[in-house]
Curated annotation (Swiss-Prot):
It holds the Pfam family Ig_3. Residues 537-620 are cytoplasmic. Residues 1-17 form the signal peptide. This is Schwann cell myelin protein. Residues 151-233, 239-322, 325-407, 414-495 form the Ig-like C2-type domain.
Length: 620
């Protein structure tokens, strides 16, 4: 016999110690007039070692202070409640920890909860909160399907309690003679110690079985008791949707009416659905649905469902709502590196499908006709491809557009406006750089072996330009060095660019700063230098002082070993004369310097108009 293991709440006086436990079925059932045998076992701590073991059963409550009716005691001489006198008996042997209870001649008033209390003598008396609930039936229980639909196989169950060992039930079916292909079967069910005889009747109901009564009868061997239960068959047929009408296409903003007609037994409930959403429902034969000011979300599949308790049937129609394109949605590579491919997809919802165009300015970059998307591709991306684009979607009901920006990342570019300007109190160099992302900018002074960056006292960062350029300003105070060379270097994650800055001398500015006295001194210096150079040429190789021009670094294809001193001497003589007369010099376009090359110098060969920028006097 299978029993349910239950946890125990121990109540009463005396010691409370684990493991006290009791086992019994939580629910029992029996037919009125029969009996029920309630299996029960209990346990207690071994250390108690009681001299005697007994017990009793309460009805309705486990608490002695509530004076519940006593059902049965293990000691037969003890009193019990009059309702159970002669009916209930303590079948188990408490010394063997068996607390089985038997109740005969059951009646409906004996249905309820039964509690066991152990008595080990003295104060060792405990009530278990776990209990068995008894249900007394007047007849077998028939379980009929919620729906008996014509043509569908059905099964009716007849359940009979089988918890009285002296009385074993016998089950028969009644009213099955006219049923189509009836098949009866039986089986025993054991639900946590409570047993039932379960009979099943399978058949295929027809419309003509409507109202037919089918039941089950129960008898017992060696007993005159009998029980009967039956039910009338309510065979119905599922509804049918017989009519459906309404438009299949409308324009956004229109009013729409849909109609549905159905029949069935019983009269069906008619419902209008869009997807799983119920829009309207009423019982009857027909139902109309009104949609006002429809939009794109109101389109789709509309279903009319006719339903009763035995089945359902539906039919659907498709409603299409035409509307102008919605704002296009942009997806793709909106941020790329120069040289990488660009792929941007523009998608727009509309009905019908729209003509999609991607524009930059007035130029068509990509187009698609009657599609829900268009893809623009550029291979490879160039810095000039960055900028604002627009996607336009249009159909016969309207148009819409969305603008988007493509950013092309590229290494720094030093702008032509970058240069150095000499003033009376020093040099001011401006470097302007364009790049994406922004670059870090420094000034390199090779002749001083110095790098000036943001944070240095001679470095000033100007506000970003309207074109996104960044500007760094280098201010060098003091006299202008003849050999001063300034490079602007910029770097971001895509590369490094360096450029020699051109020197710009405002006309007459140097001469104005020098003044008449300075002019006399400068003229004397020029005469001395010219004479000195002439002497040097005559005494070449004799160990006398000589003028040694600084050789420029070799450029691509250049020869750094060429002896260019005569030209440098001639240039120096002309340069000093021009400087003394206040002549502006230093024209020429700035030159780009790659990160791996030396800063380019002016060529040492060629006409005198392109002399080296500087020279030095060295006395041996």
């Amino acid at each position: 016999m299978e029993l349910l293991v239950l946890t125990v709440l121990l109540m009463g006086t005396g010691c409370i110690s684990a493991p006290w436990a009791a086992w019994m079925p939580p629910k029992m059932a029996a037919l009125s007039g029969t009996c029920v045998q309630l299996p029960c076992r209990f346990d207690y701590p071994e250390e108690l070692r009681p001299a005697s073991i007994g017990g009793l059963w309460y009805f309705g409550s486990p608490y002695p202070k509530n004076y519940p009716p006593v059902v049965a005691r293990s000691r037969p001489s003890s009193a019990v409640h009059e309702s159970f006198a002669g009916r209930a008996s303590f079948l188990g042997d408490p010394t063997g920890r068996d607390c089985t209870l038997n109740i005969a001649r059951l009646s409906e008033e004996l249905a309820g909860k039964y509690y066991f209390r152990g008595d080990l003598g003295g104060y060792n008396q405990y009530s278990f909160s776990e209990h068995a609930e008894l249900d007394v039936w007047a007849a077998p229980h028939l379980e009929v399907p919620h729906e008996l639909v014509a043509g569908s196989e059905a099964e009716i169950l007849c359940r009979v309690p089988d918890n009285c060992p002296p009385l074993r039930p016998l089950l028969t079916w009644t009213g099955t003679e006219e049923l189509l292909d009836p098949i009866g079967k039986e089986r025993i069910e054991d639900d946590l110690g409570s047993k039932s005889l379960l009979g099943s009747l399978r058949f295929r109901p027809r419309k003509e079985d409507l109202g037919r009564r089918v039941g089950c009868g129960v008898t017992f061997i060696n007993s005159s008791l009998s029980f009967q239960a039956d039910v009338g068959l309510d065979v119905q047929y599922e509804p049918q949707v017989v009519g459906l009408w309404g438009p299949t296409e409308v324009v956004e903003g229109s009013d729409v009416e849909l109609g549905c007609e159905a029949e069935g037994r019983p009269a069906p409930l008619i419902s209008w659905f869009r997807g799983s959403e119920v829009l309207r429902e009423e019982p009857g034969r027909n139902l109309r649905l009104l949609l006002s000011n429809v939009g794109p979300d109101d389109g789709g599949s509309f279903s009319c469902v006719a339903e009763n308790r035995h089945g359902r049937h539906n039919r659907s129609l498709q409603l299409r709502v035409a509307y102008a394109p919605r704002a296009p949605v942009i997806n793709g590579s909106l941020w790329v590196v120069s040289g990488d491919p660009v792929s941007v997809t523009c998608r727009a919802e509309s009905e019908p499908a729209a003509i999609l165009t991607v524009l930059r300015g007035g130029k068509v970059m990509a187009a698609a006709i009657y599609e829900d998307h268009v893809t623009m591709e550029m291979r490879p991306a160039r810095p000039e491809d960055g900028g604002t684009y627009s996607c336009v979607a249009e159909n016969q009901h309207g148009a819409s557009s969305t603008s988007f920006n493509i950013s092309v990342e590229y290494p720094p570019l030093v702008l032509p406006a970058s240069r150095c300007t000499a003033g009376g109190d020093g040099v001011r160099c401006v470097c302007m750089v364009n790049s994406i992302p922004d670059s870090s900018l420094v000034f390199e002074l090779p002749t001083r072996n110095q790098t000036v960056s943001d944070g240095h006292r001679d470095f000033t960062a100007a506000p970003p330009g309207s074109d996104g350029s960044i500007t760094g300003i280098l201010t060098l105070r003091g006299p202008l060095e003849p050999r001063l060379l300034v490079l602007c270097a910029a770097r971001n994650r895509h590369g490094t660019t360096a450029r020699q800055l051109r020197f710009h001398h405002p006309g007459g500015l140097v001469w104005a700063k020098v003044g008449p006295v300075g002019a006399v001194v400068a003229f004397a210096i020029v005469i001395a230098v010219v004479c000195y150079l002439s002497q040097s040429r005559r005494k070449k190789g004799a160990g006398s002082p000589e003028v040694t021009p600084v050789q420029p670094m070799a450029g691509p294809g250049g020869d750094p070993d060429l002896d260019l001193r005569p030209q440098q001497v001639r240039w120096l003589r002309g340069a000093m004369e021009r400087w003394a007369l206040g002549v502006k010099e230093g024209s020429g376009a700035p030159q780009e310097v790659t990160p791996t090359s030396h800063p380019p110098m002016k060529p040492t060969r060629g006409p005198l108009e392109d002399p080296p920028e500087y020279a030095e006097i060295r006395v041996k």
